Swiss-Prot record:
Any one biological process term the GO annotation gives: rRNA base methylation
Matching HAMAP family: 16SrRNA_methyltr_H (MF_01007)
Protein's name according to its UniProt entry: Ribosomal RNA small subunit methyltransferase H
Lineage: Bacteria, Pseudomonadati, Thermodesulfobacteriota, Desulfuromonadia, Desulfuromonadales
Pfam family, one: Methyltransf_5
Chief location bin: cytoplasm
Keyword Cytoplasm among UniProt keywords: yes
Presence of the UniProt keyword Zinc-finger in the record: no
Class of the enzyme per the UniProt entry, highest EC level: transferase
Family: Belongs to the methyltransferase superfamily. RsmH family.
SUPFAM superfamilies: Putative methyltransferase TM0872, insert domain, S-adenosyl-L-methionine-dependent methyltransferases
Amino acid sequence: MTREVFQHSSVMPEEVLECLRPQPGEVFVDGTVGGGGHARLILEATAPDGLLVGLDRDREALEEAGRQLASFGERVLLRHGNFADATRILAELDIATVDGILLDLGVSSFQLDTARRGFSFQSDAPLDMRMDTSAGMTAADVVNALSPEELARIFREYGEERYARRIARRIEKVRADEPLMTTRQLAELVRDAVPGGHVPSRIHPATRVFQALRIHVNAELDSLREGLRRSLALLKPGGRMAVISFHSLEDRIVKQFFRSEVQTCICPPGLPICACNRKPGVALLTRKGLKASESEIAANPRARSAVLRAIRRL
């Protein structure tokens, strides 16, 4: 099979470097290395002897990163795995702490554009959506096995879909005759199920359902919560972490986690004086989430929804 071209534009590259400020000789983790775009920038900034550990759940992305970053030789170490497992992976490499961590969340352009991965409804493909195609349930498994109540919960919580129950009931009805196995089947089902689904619109009516299924299949929000907690523990004092999110659910988790680590007193409101003596663990490097510039969005429309937040460990 001919190798597909891995096209992925790294989002907000200048802003990422400004937040992380990589220096020569430092050690970084790119927890979602993808095609290696951000990783290359970090490796260039940490030359001549800096080290980058690149992680990714997607083996195809990891293979592409290996090709793109081959010129850096032993300065880059690539490992297959979820960034939530970074502590274990770094321990295997005898690395206890690092100077910086980058998490670029969401689906890469390559994953969206590769029809057989099943992330997009733009073409007909198997309903898969797994980041790691070697493990776990596919999106087809989910829509054909779960109860309509559970499906509605997934669509509502992970996709913020207002017609969650209606879509779930339609799935239950359709799958009774034949299983839903392709992206086109599901996209057309959603279009038929929701009011105005066939009215031309900039946003496809199945967008939120596909997002919700992808998040559920890959346990993305649970991985993010665990990954943030473990990543912070890996940072040296003064170390920096930057996170790029692409939808409100992710950004809310990142924002709340960072704010909780900045907090000082966590005593109950009724106490007259502070008794916890808690000191903040981090300093915010971004008071508000940073957004891509208009010029970047014009060149890379997928950057429109990106939000960058960063912290420095105290």
